[in-house]
């Protein structure tokens, strides 16, 4: 990918990977989140330490043939009734099954596409499905066990803010804007994701740390 000043997708993919600590698990939902990072890993050799999965592809029966390519996965979810719609119970159960079966296998953390969750389902301090907290983490949410954030909300907020600083540094000249790219393009979508990442830090997942 071209990393020139106009290469918004390259920057987006690099920023997504940079937010994942060594050995982490990255779960993509949107094409925008999946393809730039996948290209960098597959074609440019970036971040071979990261396990990267698409929640759009995971439910397909044929994907079972790909399991050996991801040896660090401890347990694969039951995808018989899975959905790819984040607003549905079946999709949330898919994500939860991945987290439940693999949180111990990835001590560096599990990171979910920022747009891979239905925002109205996220409660105070990022509580989600009663068992988890979703912590804003740049272009992702970090999935952590329930109670972890409540115990030290200020520390988790500091981590969220540090990831925003990292994201801002990646987009040194600012995110793609309609002045340079066509509305509806992937570059503009990348700019929207950049702005959403900033907004999420001030929303429910960290609001309790500020009160």
Segments predicted by a language model, with ranges:
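Active-site cores of enzymes that catalyze phosphoryl transfer or operate on phosphate-rich substrates
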Residues: 1-11
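C-terminal luminal/periplasmic domains and tails of membrane-associated envelope-modifying transferases
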Residues: 3, 14-25, 29-38, 44-211
